[in-house]
Amino acid sequence: MSFVDGVNSWFSAASYWDGLGPTNVVQPEDDLAFVSQFEEVESAYDNLVKNGMIAPRRKNSFASSVNNPFSTSALSEALNGSVSMSHVPSSGLLKSTLSSTPTAGSNLLGTSPAEPASGLVGSSGFGSSMLGSSLPGNATSNFGSQASTSLLHPRRSTTSLLSSSAHHSRSSYYDLATPTRSSFSYNTVGAASLPSGGLSNLSSSLRSSSKSAGFSLFESASNSFTPSSFIESANMESLSIPSRRRPSSIAPIGTRPSRKEIAFSNSSTPTDQTLRPPNPPAANGNATPVTAVNNVSAVADSPQSTGSSVSSSLPTLSLDFKQEYSGNNHDMSGLSSSLSKSHNSTSALSSQIWSSPCASTLGGVNVW
């Protein structure tokens, strides 16, 4: 391998800049998935900060978790420091739900119970929790074990929390706060084991909101969590999230996209909205039906219709037929001349048009 070949392989576009040659080619499916996820979270967050939806976070908040935006510290940071809850109608719902017990609150975010719960939202007291002053026996363990695996998915967690907190003030908090979505059993939290003042802390706007069907805490025995509710609650269209950058999706320089060919159909219904002259007649005299004709107004629908509208619109009809069939003078010149000659006589018009040799070209015409 000569020196020139080595230098060419060193600076080739398919290899890295460290001179290892083409064995070090970036495979687009390997590490780009996580990179694009990280860019999605960052761009969504920056867009929310730019619009004034959430407060800017402290610097190096992701640095402690080795640039992992889905870690526990990043999630608690996003919940605790970034989401401004002043615009939420019932701002204490998420705080009080996550802080109902220290175990349930910490397991909700996937942490271990040994970690302090002070980094989570709100205080760790029992006072204003959603389920009342006390939880039943194994509610915390049930909440923690099943919600930590099913409630927060690592792909959707940060984006759904950031975006839905800004755009949907109540819907994502239902997904976090409704225990029926995390498979509560009926004997764990039932109507009998709940305290009497269970719903007294909920505001009236929360109880009578449009998503009260998801709040079926007393009716459903077991309702497994559906992760699609995060995507439904998050208004992802308003966020500028970039798509995954694939090298194969970039067209080479100098190419242009292929032109769409308009499919002509010989049926009576036109395929597209543009009005076009019909196909020329076939060799045997049986022409294809005319799909549409431009600039024809108030033409008689059938040969039986008579009256002033037929005679008044006939010069326009003959003019437009001459324009439309200028490339087909061999077939349509006789028709246009007969139309222009006989527009004063209705009987002559009907006899010449509908019994002329060119009647096959007008068969099935629906002119409007």
Curated annotation (Swiss-Prot):
Gene Ontology CC terms, in alphabetical order: cytosol
GO terms classed as biological process: cellular response to heat
Listed Low complexity bias regions: 238-253
Residue ranges with Polar residues bias: 264-276
Annotated segments matching region Disordered: 237-287
Source taxon at top rank: Eukaryota
Protein name as annotated: Uncharacterized protein C17D1.05
